Amino acid sequence: MKSITKYCGCLALSIALLLPLVSCAQSKTERVVVLKKPGLPVVYFRVMISAGSAMDPTAKPGLAYFTANLLNKGTTSYTRDQLEDKLSQIGAQIGISVDKEVVVITGKTLAEKVGEFYSIFREVLTAPTFAEDQVKKMQSEQLDRINGIREDDSRLALGVFENKLFEGHRYGHLVEGTEEAIKRFTRDDAYRFYRDNYLQGNILAGLAGAVEDTLVERFEADLGKMPSGQVVRSAAEPKVEKTRRVILVEKENRAQTQLRIGHVVDYNRTNPDYFPMRLLAAYLGENREAFGRLYQTVREQRGLAYGAYAYCEHFRPAGWSKLIDNGIVRNGQYFHMMTYPKEANGKFCIKLMLSEMTKLTTTQVSQDDIDRVQAYVANQYAFLMETPDKQLGMRLDELWYKMPTFVDKYQESINKVPHSELQSVALDHLHPDHVLIVAVVSNGEATKKELLGIDTKLELPSGAQEGALKEINDQIKAFDLDLKPEDIVIVKAREMFK
């Protein structure tokens, strides 16, 4: 855990430099956030619409993604090419992302070009045309996106994992949908979805940077012209399984096996247990950091994979950052662990990770380890709030969760988590006996036989010896997966998301 210390010091310095970055201005509506930074040559826009894939009609998975990604493909005043050319001329950007609950439209422009930019941005939001030629192109792009997920073992494993975890629930399909549904999408489908979901009551929005009052007034006025109404989301909970289950995704000639292990949880950011779970997940395996237990046991001690991590909620990185992105708010969440060893070590890694997960429920983490992790997570706040754009994203996320103090009290909430409560929180929310395991493998039947067998292989890197780890390795090998043949399902990668 020593590698955390220097990083925490740098983070603390970053916080001191960060605090005066923006000031929060009063908006006429509680649904618009304004963060002013006079003198900054940039203006950021962010609109969050509760029109994500959870709102897809049952027979049309992927329609939310389809609709959102047509918004910037042509408006009343601009064709797709004209829009792209205009943005290029003024050095501005418009981005669209879609998750289960929300669509997020972002904009970035030089302050001196904000008038020209806003005339485009407002039309993307309020006046898309869903041109017929763009509908066909979008279908092709969306189908390519799904094929890309199948080709990428990491995204494939996560997609299968999420679909199964939330089977029968509104989260139970890829955000991008299925190939069969996409091929049937029409312009009218996109128009109706937009009409029914892009409503005032579904929208949260914000501005940051060199924001003038006149821009705020215009922005709010245009949002106020959106159709009134709000779509009430289903409150149905996902089904919770009480056994271990395995899905083997068969894909030829795999050098590694992508592993996902976890289960649905009954908390999200609105639950007081979120912060203890955030610490436990960081202790177990902070994303792309080397200090976590999984990283240490899988990579550092045994050299079985390049990384191993754990997440207390759905995780999507912010670009190339190690940090979680904004705009992936979810009512329903899940805990999961991941790694990617060579196939021969897949079973051993499953046992090792479940063993570490189990220890959190049976053994108290040392005070020193938690102190270091607590400092790391609390000080990470500096990078979560590093720019006006990131701050705007954090503020809108807390507004969506209806938690007005989440951002301001983030560090305090992390720092006040009692060490004595962590094991009981783990007992409440971590269930190693109830996990779903997804593995991308070359031969499903051979892997199934291995998982059901008595022996557990361990192939260390060339020249490495078990040494002092032999006794611990033997204990891990003896970990009982308690699997029956009916608990293991084999599927073909090429058949996923059809």
Mark where each language-model region is.
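Bacterial N-terminal signal peptides
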Residues: 10-20
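Bacterial N-terminal signal peptides that target proteins for export
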Residues: 1-12
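N-terminal glycine-/lysine-enriched basic segments
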Residues: 146
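His/Glu-rich zincin catalytic helix
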Residues: 24-93, 106-109, 119-120, 191-302, ...
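Mature hydrolase/peptidase catalytic cores and their serpin-fold inhibitory cores, especially
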Residues: 421-424
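Short glycine/Trp-rich loop-beta-loop segment that forms part of the substrate-binding cleft
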Residues: 135
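M16 family metallopeptidases and their MPP-like homologs
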Residues: 35, 40-66, 80-126, 139, ...
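Alpha-helical scaffold elements lining the catalytic groove of polysaccharide deacetylases
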Residues: 182-185, 190
